[in-house]
Design a protein with these regions (language model features):
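Conserved N-terminal structural module of periplasmic/extracytoplasmic solute-binding proteins
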Residues: 8, 19-90, 94-95, 242, ...
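Extracytoplasmic/periplasmic substrate-binding proteins
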Residues: 29, 194-197, 228-310
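Hinge/lid segment of periplasmic solute-binding proteins
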Residues: 84-139, 191, 279-281, 350
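Extracytoplasmic/periplasmic solute-binding protein
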Residues: 128-133, 165-212, 258
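Long, aromatic- and glycine/proline-rich binding clefts that accommodate carbohydrate-like moieties
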Residues: 282-285, 331-383, 387
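Conserved C-terminal helix/tail region of periplasmic/extracytoplasmic solute-binding proteins
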Residues: 45-48, 73, 149, 363-412
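Glycine-centered hinge/linker elements that transmit conformational signals in sensory
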Residues: 166-168, 210-242
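Extracytoplasmic/periplasmic substrate-recognition and gating elements
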Residues: 22, 44, 48-49, 149, ...
C-alpha cells in the first residue's frame, strides 16, 4: 500500500514540476485580516524572486494536519505547508517525502540568530525540518494601563505570583475584575503549561512535556506547586468565565472591565484591532517571577522528492521567510514577534521588543508541548487539569493519581 501511495505522489510531483517549476502551492489555515496581511509579506518576497504563489487555504480548527496528509497521500501535495507538529514530518519521512533543512540553515548561518526554543521547535529527530516564521509566548500577561492606574497597582513591578495575587484586592476595591480568564479546556491547558514553565522551570517542564516524559515528576513538589497555583487562578475566575472565548475575554481587558489576562500573546491582535497601542494603552509582562516561558513557533515545512527547479524555489521560500527584514515586517503585520533575534526593531511594538528581550536568555525558554510531546499524553493532561479546574472539590492528590494512571496507559 505504501509503495502505491508513494508512486502516485511521485508521479503527481513530476507532472507538476514539468508544468511549472517555480509555481509553489502554499498550504495554510490563516484567514484573519492580520494573518492575510502577514502572508502577503511572504508572497511579495517570493514573487520578487520570480516565483508564483498559489494558495490552498483551509479554515481554522479543521484538523489541518489530517487534511495535509490526505492531500499528500491523494497525490496532490502542496510544496509548502504551515505545520508545527513533529508527527507530520515523521509521516512524510515514512513516505520518502521529507525535506530536511539542516544543511540549508547551516550554510546560510541562520541558526545562530534564533533563540534556543526556536531551534528546538524546528528540529525533528535531529534534523532541522521547519522554517520558523513567528513567535508567540504562551503565557504573557497583558494589562490595561488605565485600570492599573485607577486601582493603584503596577503589574510591571510584580516579582512573584504572590505579589500579583496580593494586589488583586486593590483591583476589586476599585471596582474591576483582577484577572479575566476564559474557562475552556484549551485555554486552561495553555495556562497549565505556561504555569509549569513559570513555577517549575525548564527541567520540570521538559520532564513533563519532553519527547520522553519522566514519570518521576508527576508526584513531585513542582507538580504540586503547579496544581496549587492553578487552583488559585481558578478561584480568581469571574462568574462569566465558563466556556468564554479567549478574544471575548481579551475584550474585557480592552474595555476596562478587567485589569489583565494571562494567555498567548496573540491577544495583541485584538488590542491592535481596537486601535490600542502597546506601552501607552496596554502593558505586557511575563508571568511574574517566571523561571521560564513556553514559546509557540509558527513554522512552515517543504516537501521533498521534487525536481531540482522546484526544490530550489522552495529554498527561495525558506530564504524569504528567514530574512531579518521580512521577519520584522511579517511580525508587524500579524502582531507576532520575529523568530530572529537580529530582526530590525524599528517596526516592532513595545511588546514584541519585550518578547525578544526575554528570549535573549537561552535558559529561560521552553518549546510549546505541541512541538515536542506525544499528542495523546498532552491531551490526557488537558483532560485532567480541566476536570481539576471545573471541579473545586477535586484535590491535588486526585489529579496526580489520574495523571499517573494516564501515563501508565499511554506511555508506560
Amino acid at each position: 500500500m505504501l509503495k502505491s501511495i508513494l508512486g502516485g505522489v511521485t508521479a503527481a510531483l513530476m507532472l507538476s514540476s514539468a508544468a511549472n517549476a517555480t509555481d509553489l502551492i502554499i498550504y495554510h489555515n490563516w484567514s484573519s485580516g492580520p494573518e492575510v496581511a502577514a502572508l502577503n509579506v511572504l508572497k511579495d518576497g517570493l514573487e520578487a524572486k520570480g516565483h508564483t504563489w498559489t494558495d490552498i487555504a483551509i479554515p481554522h480548527n479543521t484538523g489541518s494536519n489530517v487534511n495535509l496528509m490526505n492531500l499528500v497521500t491523494g497525490g496532490t501535495p502542496p510544496n509548502v505547508f504551515l505545520e508545527s507538529s513533529p508527527g507530520v514530518y515523521r509521516d512524510l519521512a515514512g513516505l520518502g517525502l521529507a525535506r530536511p533543512l539542516t544543511e540549508f540553515f547551516t550554510e546560510q548561518g541562520i541558526l545562530e540568530h534564533y533563540p534556543s526554543s526556536v531551534v528546538s521547535s524546528i528540529t525533528v529527530d535531529g534534523e532541522i525540518m521547519k522554517i520558523p516564521t513567528a513567535i508567540h509566548i504562551d503565557g504573557m500577561a497583558y494589562y490595561n494601563m488605565e485600570v492599573a492606574e485607577a486601582a493603584g497597582v503596577d503589574p510591571a513591578a510584580w516579582d512573584s505570583l504572590d505579589a500579583m495575587f496580593a494586589d488583586f484586592q486593590k483591583v476589586r476595591d476599585a471596582g474591576y475584575i483582577p484577572l479575566a480568564i476564559g474557562g475552556q479546556q484549551w485555554q486552561v491547558g495553555y495556562l497549565v503549561h505556561a504555569l509549569a514553565a513559570a513555577t517549575g522551570g525548564p527541567d520540570f517542564y521538559s520532564a513533563l512535556y519532553g519527547g520522553e516524559p519522566d514519570p518521576s515528576v508527576i508526584d513531585s513538589a513542582e507538580m504540586r506547586t503547579l496544581l496549587e497555583t492553578l487552583r488559585r487562578f481558578q478561584q480568581e475566575a469571574d462568574e462569566g468565565s465558563a466556556n468564554r472565548e479567549w478574544n471575548v475575554t481579551t475584550n474585557m481587558v480592552i474595555t476596562g472591565q478587567a485589569l489583565m489576562q494571562i494567555h498567548g500573546d496573540w491577544m495583541k491582535g485584538e488590542w491592535s484591532a481596537a486601535g490600542k497601542t502597546a506601552g501607552t494603552d496596554f502593558g505586557c509582562i511575563q508571568i511574574p517571577g517566571a523561571k521560564a516561558v513556553p514559546v509557540t513557533v509558527d513554522s512552515w515545512g517543504i516537501l521533498g522528492g521534487q525536481s531540482e527547479e522546484v526544490d530550489a524555489a522552495e529554498l527561495d521560500f525558506a530564504a524569504v521567510v528567514a530574512d531579518p527584514q521580512v521577519q520584522a515586517d511579517f511580525a508587524s503585520a500579524k502582531g507576532s514577534t520575529p523568530t530572529r533575534l537580529d530582526a530590525p526593531s524599528e517596526v516592532l511594538d513595545a511588546c514584541s521588543v519585550e518578547v525578544l528581550r526575554i528570549l535573549e536568555d537561552a535558559d529561560h525558554q521552553v518549546p510549546n508541548p505541541h512541538s515536542t510531546v506525544d499528542a495523546d499524553w498532552q491531551n490526557s493532561i488537558w483532560d485532567v487539569v480541566f476536570n481539576f479546574w471545573s471541579d473545586p472539590s477535586m484535590s491535588v492528590d486526585d489529579a496526580i493519581a489520574q495523571i499517573q494512571e494516564n501515563y501508565e496507559t499511554i506511555l508506560g
